[in-house]
Amino acid sequence: MTEELDNTPSPAGDIPQETLPKPLPAPEETAGEQPAAAPEENRGNAVREEEEAAPVLEQIDINELRKRPLNDLQEMAEGLPIRNAASLTKSQLVFELGKQLLAKGHEVVVSGVMEQAKDNYAMLRDPVKSFRTSPDDIYLGGNLIKPLHLRVGQQIKVRLRKLRPHDKYLSAASVISVEDIPAEDYRARSDFERLTPLFPKERLLLENKGVNSAAMRVLDLMTPFGKGQRGLIVAPPRGGKTVLLKTIARSIRANYPEVELIVLLLDERPEEVTDFEETVDAPVFASTFDEPSRRHAQVSDLVIERAKRLVEMGRDVVILLDSLTRLARGYNANQTGGRIMSGGLGSNALEKPRKFFSAARNVEEGGSLTIIATCLVDTESRMDEVIFEEFKGTGNLEIRLDRELSERRIYPAISLSQSGTRNDDRLYNEQEFVKIMQLRRQLAMKPGWEGLQTLLQNISKTQNNAELLLTGLR
């Protein structure tokens, strides 16, 4: 019936418009009152108002919490249900704060260096703590590792999830970035072992007016450094190796700020570690002499893996290691089983130190890894002698420090006749190489300490090595 009425033509067209009933006027709106909305509109408005009223919780970075002093963290914990906050260590307090912030709905992120724990999971360690195990380390599950083909030593940033009742660590929910590349754009690189090794070709000049120029100028003339060098600083006790290594670090940082410089100190005195951290603008990873040997092995493993990942990215990396002897001692003490060889070394004790040192190389695909390591001699230890003999022929650069020169207070105490670089002609241009060979022949005609003293006197009279090579020895 309704359809029939709707389809019937309206008679309004035949009736004058003025005779039609006028529409009722709209009701007047009372001032200050809004017209009533439909129930659906009311519900929609209410939802929008709730969304607008909901507070936006700020993103929290665990790395920023780690930088803050303990007093600040304790103040943050005052309004949170954290038991005995005043008695917790800084790392424990960071863990508890992260746990509470996640429970409140904050987005919590953190970055760290990946260390493989077992086949199905890994941990993100804090580089600032030299990769020491800590309560605020981050658990990284296999479900995040396998899809992206993540590797040990990579810098990874993750987003954390709320903790479950039996969780012992803060746990990653998703990967945000790998080596500062967004996770969705990241692609696995060629493995370090598959890259093509080459001779060092590009020079690392150490001469710099801002540091001990004399020592660095001697090294540039007698033992030139190249990117991808594998060098040994062979030193007796109190021969000045630590000071020389520190000066090399400062020169590289001043001349090549783009180079990834890493300092690794093993079995070292705590005050020496602090001195390096304060005077060298580079990450310092250390394991002091009061820590167990397995700790020496752990930090060295992570440092070399971190360096390999950087080389895979095409970076130039320099590792300064003090010392290779202590690294070998640490692996030897950490070894279980096997035969005992000469000097008390285990049959397989030098396998990992050898792999560490042999990783130094220039790479055809781009990037390089340079390792300059100190090696102890004249310590009256048979083990140290065996370690030195094992590594003696593996490097392509050797700097020999002389005890007689150091006793005469001649620094740097470098033995000119016993120091040198293999294939150094690749690092000099032709004219420079001719001048260098003339200089070395002149110095070789003098006794050891007289030759070095003559060179240092000529260095003090010239502004730079270029001037010295042009004028010759005086």
Swiss-Prot record:
Presence of the UniProt keyword Transcription regulation in the record: yes
Give a short account of what the protein does.
Facilitates transcription termination by a mechanism that involves Rho binding to the nascent RNA, activation of Rho's RNA-dependent ATPase activity, and release of the mRNA from the DNA template.
Question: Which EC class is the enzyme in?
Answer: hydrolase
For this protein, the record's PANTHER family field holds: TRANSCRIPTION TERMINATION FACTOR RHO (PTHR46425:SF1)
Q: Which gene encodes it?
A: rho
Name assigned to this protein: Transcription termination factor Rho
| Region spans: Disordered | 1-60
Tell me the GO BP annotations in alphabetical order.
Answer: DNA-templated transcription termination
Per its UniProt record, what HAMAP family does this chain match?
Rho
Which parts of the sequence bind ATP? Answer: G226, K227, G228, Q229, R230, G231, R238, G239, G240, K241, T242, V243, R269
State the organism named in the record: Akkermansia muciniphila (strain ATCC BAA-835 / DSM 22959 / JCM 33894 / BCRC 81048 / CCUG 64013 / CIP 107961 / Muc)
Q: Which GO terms describe its molecular function?
A: ATP binding; ATP hydrolysis activity; ATP-dependent activity, acting on RNA; helicase activity; RNA binding
Q: Do you know which Gene3D superfamilies this protein is assigned to?
A: Nucleic acid-binding proteins, P-loop containing nucleotide triphosphate hydrolases
- The EC number of this protein is 3.6.4.-
User: What family is reported?
Assistant: Belongs to the Rho family.
Q: Which SMART domains match?
A: AAA, Rho_N
- NCBIfam families associated with the record: PRK09376.1
Record keywords = ATP-binding, Helicase, Hydrolase, Nucleotide-binding, RNA-binding, Transcription, Transcription regulation, Transcription termination
Quaternary structure, from the entry: Homohexamer. The homohexamer assembles into an open ring structure.
Q: Which residues form the Rho RNA-BD domain?
A: 107-182
Q: Which InterPro entries match?
A: AAA+_ATPase, ATPase_F1/V1/A1_a/bsu_nucl-bd, NA-bd_OB-fold, P-loop_NTPase, Rho-like_N, Rho_factor_ATP-bd, Rho_N_sf, Rho_RNA-bd
